[in-house]
């Protein structure tokens, strides 16, 4: 399946998201310097925010399968293929995966994504992972009501009938499914946001 680019390139909204992540992870309480990785950096605004913030002292790396960045300075960037990360084990104090896991592929590829986060994260490190809830009333990528509620084989036909695409290339998860895949990946998590019909936030 050919996967579409879904990155938000709006600087203002991405900066607000970066501020939210910093607040939820309490980055200002981390002893510096902090090695931080953003997976699926899209616009680059979040990576840039952490790289230049005077209070955080972050050494930032970022990866994505495409280079769509509008903010390119003050951090290291690499284009990657798939979910494998080009970093050594226990390399980072913080790993951010913001609305990425629903784009990496099927359940096995999603598990690889989580396993790679665990591999590169230091034993006492922290991660931030957000994913659209499958049960959101309006699917956020295509703005169609109940799109992700449908069985997998009906999502692409609905997309075509709506005129908004030809195939549905995302795999959002319910809270239960996501917690199951976390357990399979051997990752300890805390739910830090989300309701039955909103984004799921974990650290």
State what each model feature region is.
Residues 84, 102, 136:
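Active-site micro-motifs of SAM-dependent methyltransferase domains
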Residues 1-84, 88, 94-98, 114:
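Conserved N-terminal segment of class I S-adenosyl-L-methionine
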Residues 96-108:
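A short SAM/SAH-binding and catalytic strip from SAM-dependent methyltransferases
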Residues 105-117, 126-203:
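S-adenosyl-L-methionine-dependent methyltransferase catalytic module, highlighting the catalytic core
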């Amino acid at each position: 399946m050919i996967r579409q680019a879904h990155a938000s390139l709006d600087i203002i909204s991405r900066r607000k998201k970066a501020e939210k992540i910093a607040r939820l992870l309490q980055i200002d309480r981390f002893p510096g310097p902090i090695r931080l990785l953003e997976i699926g950096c899209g616009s680059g605004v979040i990576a840039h925010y952490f790289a230049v913030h005077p209070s955080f002292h972050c050494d930032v790396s970022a990866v994505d399968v495409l280079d769509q960045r509008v903010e390119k300075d003050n951090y290291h960037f690499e284009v990657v293929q798939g979910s494998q990360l080009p970093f050594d084990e226990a390399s980072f104090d913080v790993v951010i995966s913001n609305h990425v896991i629903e784009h990496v592929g099927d359940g096995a590829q999603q598990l690889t994504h989580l396993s790679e986060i665990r591999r590169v994260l230091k034993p006492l490190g922290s991660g931030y992972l957000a994913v659209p809830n499958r049960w959101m009333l309006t699917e956020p990528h295509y703005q169609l009501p109940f799109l992700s509620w449908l069985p997998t084989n009906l999502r692409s036909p609905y997309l075509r009938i709506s005129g908004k695409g030809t195939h549905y290339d995302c795999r959002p998860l319910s809270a239960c499914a996501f917690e199951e895949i976390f357990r399979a990946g051997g990752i300890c998590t805390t739910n830090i946001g989300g309701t039955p019909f909103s984004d799921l936030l974990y650290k």
